[in-house]
Amino acid sequence: MTGGSVLKDRDRLGRIAVFVACLLPLVWYGARFVGGDLGANPIEAFTRKLGEWGLIFLLASLAATPARLLWGWTFPLRRRRMVGLFAFFYVCLHLLSYIGLDQFFDWGAIWADIVKRTYITVGMAALLLLVPLAVTSTRGMVRRLGGKRWIALHRLVYPAAVLGVLHYMLMVKADLSEPLIFAGILGLLLAVRLVPAVRRRRSGRAPS
């Protein structure tokens, strides 16, 4: 077996491992939901867990570049697209659970919630920002848009992540500890990305 084939096999195994790992939360909480093991309000708990994991995967996709900058890890970059698509997948399931299980497809009530409840308005805005990112995630779309335009478009992931964390914070009624942890992680990830850009800008300035 050649070195190239070994690397290909490792890459394939890595893709499979990440794919399976990303499905595990859905399997775990889906089984608990069906088995009636999610507390007194299983629909709310199931819907919330789907949203939490969507946010976790979104932050994980944002962590790929900081992992390379800080520790030289390239594996997260190779799996960033898959993890980002799973983030979108879980966010969509979060929305579908709210629409179908919580509201029973009562579109009038759903629209009223979007208009009147700030956390739902913010959550919908975050989802809408993620839609073009998911649609243009393929290599073919990168070629169609061109590298610069594609990169500019995919910077929408940052406001989407901020809105996702804000949605979580507004949704929680009492204990803000978990949303604040998410906010702290997002802040660190954004800070790590900003530091090299600031250094490049400063080094590019000619001394007066």
UniProtKB/Swiss-Prot annotation:
Superkingdom of the source species: Bacteria
Membrane topology: Multi-pass membrane protein
Residue stretches spanning the membrane: 16-36, 53-73, 82-102, 118-138, 156-176, 178-198
GO molecular function ontology, one term from the record: electron transfer activity
Essential cofactor(s): FMN; heme b
Stored InterPro entries: Fe3_Rdtase_TM_dom, MsrQ-like
Subcellular location: Cell inner membrane
Cofactor binding annotation: Binds 1 FMN per subunit. Binds 1 heme b (iron(II)-protoporphyrin IX) group per subunit.
Any one annotated GO CC term: plasma membrane
Record keywords: Cell inner membrane, Cell membrane, Electron transport, Flavoprotein, FMN, Heme, Iron, Membrane, Metal-binding, Transmembrane, Transmembrane helix, Transport
Biological process, per Gene Ontology: protein repair
Primary location group: membrane
Record function comment: Part of the MsrPQ system that repairs oxidized periplasmic proteins containing methionine sulfoxide residues (Met-O), using respiratory chain electrons. Thus protects these proteins from oxidative-stress damage caused by reactive species of oxygen and chlorine generated by the host defense mechanisms. MsrPQ is essential for the maintenance of envelope integrity under bleach stress, rescuing a wide series of structurally unrelated periplasmic proteins from methionine oxidation.
Assembly, per entry: Heterodimer of a catalytic subunit (MsrP) and a heme-binding subunit (MsrQ).
Similarity comment: Belongs to the MsrQ family.
Descriptive protein name: Protein-methionine-sulfoxide reductase heme-binding subunit MsrQ
